[in-house]
Regions:
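Alpha-helical transmembrane segments
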Residues: 1-31, 61-108, 136-143, 152, ...
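Juxtamembrane helix-capping/reentrant segments at transmembrane boundaries
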Residues: 40-54, 117-130, 301, 306
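Hydrophobic transmembrane alpha-helix segments characteristic of membrane transport
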Residues: 108-116
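Membrane interface segments of multi-pass transport proteins and intramembrane proteases
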Residues: 115-123, 152-160
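Juxtamembrane helix-loop transition segments at the membrane interface in multi-pass membrane proteins
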Residues: 34-35, 117-118, 243
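Alpha-helical transmembrane segments and immediately membrane-proximal extracytoplasmic
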Residues: 37-54, 81, 87-91, 213
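Carboxylate/His-rich catalytic cores and anion/metal-binding grooves
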Residues: 126-140
Length: 336
């Protein structure tokens, strides 16, 4: 137990330190490359002052997480297979597969935006094709490792065998969740702070359920979130871009699936799901009513902006909601 605690502490500290230091060097480099964000014209007018803020800053914490896990591997390599076991090591690699694959799609999207100096990168069709291919690879990996099960533990209903229905729901659910995290990256520090809280949930869940690899990746990611907040907290000196938010989406989603507990995303990803559902509801209602809206603006954090809330207040509010979701999830694990 002491060995695992030191492993997790090293991952968290390493993730923080490497990401924070990476930002010190990467932000000036992004400035020199003119990799600035183009702000949406339909967004709040006061966001125009953010125009030109460096984007693709997610590279900082991707580097931080990758380097941290690599250092931990070298430091603990004689004992790591014994502590984790080969199945957990393989499952950990599968988490990184979805995370880095999603991050690569986000990187392509960001790169097109900065090269063309507009806020539209990959088309929706291009992004969907890439995500379908990536998700197929991830689910094939789950199947190969014996982690793809049709039995899901639902709150209240208990263990339910969904049969063949599970596969399409899981497939498109993964794509939905990755994009939901991407949608949450709309304000300075918002997605970073919410993901930090979500990772605390996964760290605790992994510890309670015996999935050390989940706790290890969550600890490194939580540390990296804290390190990135040094640069991304309001007023942000850098944005994570789709590179970072898609990467986070991959981690948030994959961690639940490799534990064979996808229902935990309902708790640990409550803010992302809420955010995405408001967009879906708004678009559906807008089309059905030929121009009417339910919310003043979506994703929903912007609706609070329109009410006059400051970004820091909105960040704190959604981090609190994420914390409540984590608390509910941990309680659910303990009583289920």
């Amino acid at each position: 137990m002491e060995q695992i605690s030191s492993l997790l502490a090293a991952a968290a500290v390493g993730g923080f330190a490497i990401t924070a230091v990476a930002g010190k060097f990467m932000i000036p480099a992004l400035h020199r490359l003119h990799f600035g964000q183009t702000i949406r014209e339909e967004g709040p007018t006061w966001h125009s002052k953010k125009n030109g803020t460096p984007t693709m800053g997610g590279l900082c914490f991707i580097l931080g997480i990758l380097a941290t896990l690599g250092i931990v591997w070298v430091m603990y390599s004689p004992k790591l297979p014994e502590v984790l076991g080969m199945p957990q090591l393989q499952a950990g690699m599968l988490v990184l597969f979805l995370a880095f694959g999603s991050g690569l799609i986000g990187f392509l999207d960001d790169f097109i935006k900065v090269v063309r100096h507009r806020n539209l990168g990959l088309t929706e069709a291009q992004k969907m094709i890439l995500q379908i291919a990536l998700t197929f690879g991830f689910m094939f990996g789950l199947h190969s490792l014996g982690l793809l099960t049709t039995q899901v533990q639902f709150p209240i209903f208990g263990l339910v065998d969904m049969g063949l229905l599970y596969y399409p729901i899981a497939f498109f659910g993964i794509i939905f969740l990755v994009n939901a995290v991407n949608l949450t990256d709309g304000l300075d520090g918002l997605c970073t702070g919410v993901t930090f809280v979500s990772m605390i949930g996964y760290l605790l869940a992994g510890s309670l359920l015996g999935f050390v690899h989940v706790s290890l990746i969550a600890a490194a990611t939580a540390g990296a979130c804290a390190g990135f907040l040094v640069w991304n907290f309001y007023p942000a000196k850098v944005f994570m871009g789709d590179t970072g938010s898609m990467f986070f989406g991959g981690i948030v989603t994959a961690l639940a699936f490799v534990m064979q507990r996808p229902e935990l995303v309902l708790f640990f990803g409550i803010v992302y799901i809420w955010d995405a559902m408001t967009v879906v509801i708004q678009r559906t209602y807008f089309k059905a009513t030929h121009g009417k809206r339910i919310f003043r603006m979506t994703p929903i954090p912007h609706a609070y902006e329109m009410r006059g809330w400051r970004e820091v207040k909105i960040d704190g509010f959604f981090a609190l909601i994420a914390g409540i979701g984590v608390a509910m999830g941990i309680f659910y694990i303990c009583v289920a």
